[in-house]
Amino acid sequence: MRPQNARQIAGEPAAGPGPAATGPRWRLPYAPRPRFIQLETVTACPAHCPFCPQHEITRDPARMPDATWRRIVDQTRGLGITYRPFLTNEPFVDKRQPEITAYIKRNDPTARVEYNTNASLLTADLAARLLDAGVDIMRFSIDGFSPATYGPSRVGLDYAQVVANATRFLELWDAGGHRATTFTEVRMIEVPENAHEVGAYRAYWGPRCSEVVVTQLYQWPWTGQRREDVVRKPCLKVLDEMFFYTDGDATLCCWDVHGRAVVGNVHERSVLEIWDGHVMRQLRALLDDGRRDLITLCSRCNAYAGFDFSKFAATPGDDVVSGDTTGQ
């Protein structure tokens, strides 16, 4: 971690120092190496969703240099990584995605490529090129089953065009014999305004894709959470995932839009050195003790507030801060 980022990690306690440390309260099964890597290849998105802080991104460069994403991929070949070439952006703003997919898959049978897209830019040509390149997972975020319910949540996108693009991709996927090799998912965030459409949504998309998912809206960190309401629990997002910005900075979490928890840079240290480095170990130890209040980003995050972490309860003398999650 670079010195100028040190202040971004440790903050003041949210409600006093708490009891004296007697060892971790939990011991989460952190993977010895990442299993998922997200690459912010660009920072742009054509949508202006009211629930997403994407428009607040001011990172430079706006486009990840080829040398950066290739460096990350090359350093992790053969490790069974699922690469996600997007972060808080629409992946297909970046016209390099078929090339990126092909590069990741080249000479690495363990590598997988996954996209989550709003489908607004997914042309027939792009769909065919992605399938030919060997994309493994394609998830479509379509929050509604009518223009009236879709429009307010995905501001700036045309519902009919999005449905047409996603449907065409799925038709190419089906006709091309990709059902056995590429998983497809259509997902909707359920809100009161579209809850009445869930049945019709499932009926339409269910036969056309591998799976339909109806999920709930989550709250991004630092979007109104109060300091005194800090969640004193660990977090599942840091078990086996890494996240890289366009400049090669690695951050603790995919919800870190403003770079509050930068843990290293791939141009200064290798991917695995960052993953198993001192900063990450410190952060894992804090999270295992439920001390989100001492991590600036996490001190205003309520993710997993209702999750039961009891199965990860620490036992006396258990002081290992990294371990394989295989079989968990």
Segments and roles (model prediction):
Residues 44, 48, 234, 297:
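The −1 position to Zn-ligating cysteines in a subset of zinc-ribbon hairpins
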Residues 43, 89, 119-121, 144-146, ...:
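Short, flexible active-site-adjacent loop segments at beta-strand->alpha-helix junctions, enriched
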Residues 236-238:
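Short, small/polar residue-rich loop motifs at catalytic or cofactor-binding pockets
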Residues 48, 246-249:
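Residue-level recognition of short loop/turn positions
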Residues 59-61, 92-94, 123, 146-149, ...:
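Short catalytic/ligand-binding loop motif for oxyanion handling, primarily in non-cytosolic enzymes
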